[in-house]
A protein has these predicted regions:
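Extended, composition-driven regions rather than compact fold-specific motifs
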Residues: 2-280
Length: 280
């Protein structure tokens, strides 16, 4: 049966307040790190673990937080501006990219970041040649958007670039919660093992070499999912146009409440360095 989220037409003010996300601000600090290890998760996903004393005090409270990655120059030198200076060099700013922290180990002072490697760009180029000892700069996160786990369930929709955030969210969800995940990857080789204490359903959508960013494949998959029950939080992260289409369909066709439906553009066809929240 088509996906129909069983949400109240007009949630009470009390319910909306109980489900309201929190925001946290963080001090912006430029951190110098080096690569500790590189792990090939799938043909198109690398996990790079960073280390360094500058990671002390790192904080990321939201599952879809993002940090800015600052890349070395063509000589492999990471030229971070000294504390107190105003801004970054233009070339470094243009090459910055947003990535979700996968996991942070405060005791070991290590930070893992997953890289979906597809089209050429500064992040993909750096990740593909990364090796132990290579330098990388980290800035942020500037803030965290903390979504309660107290919903009856969570619907998480995305593509390869969204997998790190989806993985984080699944780690956070408690037993007794429903989690429905719909992820588009190229083929079965790019599927990852997803774990959660929640009652988890995972639906993989394969594009089989077709260009990424087509909303129709995920829209078709949603129509095949059995209806969940209870109040659901909906989270979408995709190519910009596709994310807008998915959010609109969830609200207009599947009964999702706008306040419980967050969509983000993790990339945009024809553009570089895009990361934006979609409000409508």
């Amino acid at each position: 049966m088509p996906l129909q989220l069983s949400l109240p037409t007009s949630p009470s003010p009390e319910l909306l307040a109980a489900r309201a996300p929190e925001r946290a601000r963080h001090e912006i600090k430029l951190r110098r790190t080096t690569v500790e290890s590189v792990e090939q998760l799938t043909p198109h996903m690398l996990r790079i673990r960073l280390q360094g004393a500058d990671l002390a005090g790192f904080s990321s409270l939201g599952f879809d937080d993002h940090v800015k990655l600052l890349f070395p120059d063509s000589n492999g030198e990471l030229q971070l501006p000294p504390p107190g200076s105003e801004g970054l060099p233009p070339a470094m700013r243009e090459a910055m990219r947003d990535y979700t922290p996968h996991s942070y180990d405060a005791q070991a002072q290590t930070l893992a970041i997953d890289f979906a490697v597809h089209e050429a760009g500064p992040a993909t180029a750096w990740a593909l040649q990364a090796a132990a000892g290579h330098a990388l700069g980290i800035a942020g996160p500037r803030g965290s958007f903390i979504v309660p786990t107290a919903f009856d369930g969570h619907l998480l929709i995305g593509d390869d670039a969204a997998l790190p955030a989806i993985t984080r969210r699944l780690r956070e969800l408690p037993a007794g919660t429903q989690a429905v995940v719909v992820v588009e990857v190229n083929d079965a080789a790019d599927e990852q093992k997803l774990d959660s204490a929640a009652d988890l359903q995972v639906h993989w959508v394969h594009r089989q070499g077709q260009p990424a960013g087509d909303a129709q494949r995920l829209l078709a998959a949603l129509r095949q999912i059995d209806a969940p029950a209870g109040d659901y939080y909906n989270w979408v992260a995709l190519e910009s146009t596709a994310a807008k289409a998915l959010r609109a369909a969830l609200i207009a066709e599947h009964g999702a409440h706008p306040k419980w439906t967050k969509a983000a553009a993790y990339w945009k066809r024809g553009s570089s360095g895009v990361h934006e929240v979609i409000e409508e």
